Amino acid sequence: MSENPEPSKGSTPNVEGAEKVNKPPVKKGWSNPALRMMGIPKISLPSRNWMIFWTLLASVGGGVAYDRYQQKQIRKKWMEKFEPLGEEAYRTDRIPRKLSVFIAPPPNDYLDSSMVYFRKYVKPLLNASAIDFDVFTENRQGDIRAAVAERIRELRIETNENAKKAQEEAKQEQYDASWTKFFKKDVPNFFTLKFQSNSKEDEALVSSNDLYSPKDVLGLYYLKEPIDAKRDDELNPMEAGGVICIGRGAYKEYMTGVHEGLLGPLEAPEEVRTITEVDPQVTENEPETAHNDNESKAVVELPVLPTDDLPADSVDKQDAVPETPSETAENTPNAEEGDNEKPVPKPFITPDEYPNATYAPEFQNVSLIMNKKNVPVIFEQPVYVFPLPIVSGFLNTHRKLYRFFTKRNVADDYGCRTSVVVQNVSRPFVYKDQFMAKEEELEWPKKWVATGKEKNSEWVQELVTDDRVTTRMKVFDVSLAAKSTDKPIDKPTNE
């Protein structure tokens, strides 16, 4: 036997089998000869991780896209309903109805959060219905309240001055018709003029060119009389204007400002004057709204109210902001000017003093208070508030996500509420109306509310009303307008 026998066939290593074992399995898929000729590989499902990624991305993207599409459709539905009002032809001597819109930032948030809801869900419908409006915003608590109260006080002062002038004119007319004036002034003046020695001078001749110019008589330069344009509010004072408050906070400040203007004194009390003049830095440095550090440095934009109800002298005192037919022009001051901004005036009267306060004597015997343009003043116009569906906090993440994907519900709800304002369906103010948008307070941050109570913030206090003031007020009635939601709006025929 040889020392090195040849290995048997059964003991030879199976190289081909080992290669098959180490080779990865062929991925399952579907292939087509035509696709294979074009260089397209086999069509197969992606891996598990890619499946999770694409499923999540498609779900989120599809949900957002569907919600935005529905918002556009809802907005289009309401705009088509108001289209007959927008197609109405206006002559040069006619101006559409005007609303006043007050917007305040949500608690512990920026003003832009509130402006988004107005610009997306309210403003397009007002523009479609050809309704003019003025927008007033604030970044500090108390700006709206102070502006509304100051406007009413100036209106009361103007009424007092007009009453005094009327009394003086009546006394002068009575004196002119009396015998006292006849014997004291008329008779002496008659003899003085009769025996006056000074002779009259000849009337000086004046050239015709000094009296008038050729363009005063030529048709090319003929100037027509100025057009006296009138608003629709003047035609029917009972359905004039309206007030919209975006947010419960803006509504509270508006109502408090109306009460302060009608029940409070015309001049600041000694306590308020002392706080404002002696120690203004304390009021400036103490933020009434519990914003964070970054928000406390935000630029302040004071509301500028319309001057229709104010005397001519007080118009120059205000910082006039140019208004477009749809929205206020944003004139934002510099950051340095925001730091030097005057503090918000303290209220002239507190809610505890309402029962003992005297109602404005200037308006006690007046059934409907009108301004110079024969339009009811702001607190005689209907008011309504739009609640802000904004939640904050980590524990409310699930609610944030749900509302983020269902903004179409907010668009439809705001559209229904805006139809109330457009159709001008109003009713007298009742006790329950002071709780409008009360549900919004349940979603305010608890820490912010606690801080506001410590600093005696206006927003966290209960809204107190007085019957002497609310009997003059009206609100837009949602219940009546909801019944006529499906009915088309007819084109008005105002001549």
From Swiss-Prot:
- The organism named in the record is Debaryomyces hansenii (strain ATCC 36239 / CBS 767 / BCRC 21394 / JCM 1990 / NBRC 0083 / IGC 2968) (Yeast)
Q: Provide a GO CC annotation, any one.
A: mitochondrial inner membrane
Q: Where are the stretches annotated Disordered?
A: 1-27, 280-299, 307-355
- Polar residues compositional bias, start-end: 1-14, 325-334
Record's subunit section: Component of the TIM22 complex, whose core is composed of TIM22 and TIM54, associated with the 70 kDa heterohexamer composed of TIM9 and TIM10 (or TIM8 and TIM13).
Upper lineage: Eukaryota, Fungi, Dikarya, Ascomycota, Saccharomycotina
What are the transmembrane regions? Answer: 50-66
Keywords attached to this Swiss-Prot or TrEMBL record, sorted alphabetically, are: Membrane, Mitochondrion, Mitochondrion inner membrane, Protein transport, Translocation, Transmembrane, Transmembrane helix, Transport
Q: Which residues lie on this side of the membrane: Mitochondrial intermembrane?
A: 67-495
Against InterPro entries, the record matches this protein to: Lipid_Phosphate_FormReg (IPR050187), Mt_import_IM_translocase_Tim54 (IPR021056)
Name this polypeptide is given: Mitochondrial import inner membrane translocase subunit TIM54
